């Protein structure tokens, strides 16, 4: 939360990465050990789901608390999966964050080909607002 003059804004941040593996030199010599700079965070579909749950949480906060005026949800990533449009038969399409996508009010739910275990732990939910996805 960010507060200014008694008004609040919620801030939600996701940091989703793909591995970055580089050779590093120190003191004019390559490091002798393997150096993984950024680790791989798999399950991008679940991270996207959690992103939209963050948006829903901000909506709920603004509904419940008059002092909360809004918020922002961000994903910081080096993984193109988040800004590229998924295939039309993708099971997570409803939760996609691709560039140019606009999420309209309504129910967000998994496609029928998603595993039952995912459906049990990541239930459908509704968004109240309209949210454009823009990547820079």
Regions inferred by a protein language model and the residue ranges of each:
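Extended hydrophobic secondary-structure segments that form protein cores and membrane-embedded regions
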Residues: 1, 11, 72-76
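Conserved catalytic cores of phosphodiester-cleaving nucleases, focusing on short active-site segments
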Residues: 2, 7-23, 28-38, 58
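C-terminal edge-of-domain segments
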Residues: 123-136
């Amino acid at each position: 939360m960010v507060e200014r003059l008694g008004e609040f804004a919620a801030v939600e941040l996701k940091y989703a990465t793909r591995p970055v593996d580089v050779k590093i030199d120190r003191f004019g010599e390559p490091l002798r050990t393997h150096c993984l700079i950024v680790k791989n965070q798999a399950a991008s579909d679940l991270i996207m789901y959690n992103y939209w749950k963050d948006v829903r949480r901000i909506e709920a906060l603004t509904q419940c608390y008059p002092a909360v005026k809004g918020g922002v949800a961000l994903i910081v990533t080096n993984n193109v999966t988040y800004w590229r449009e998924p295939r039309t038969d993708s099971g997570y399409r409803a939760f996609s964050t691709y560039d140019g996508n606009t999420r309209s009010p309504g129910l967000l739910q998994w496609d029928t080909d998603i595993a039952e275990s995912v459906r049990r732990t990541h239930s459908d939910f509704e968004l109240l607002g309209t949210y454009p996805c823009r990547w820079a």
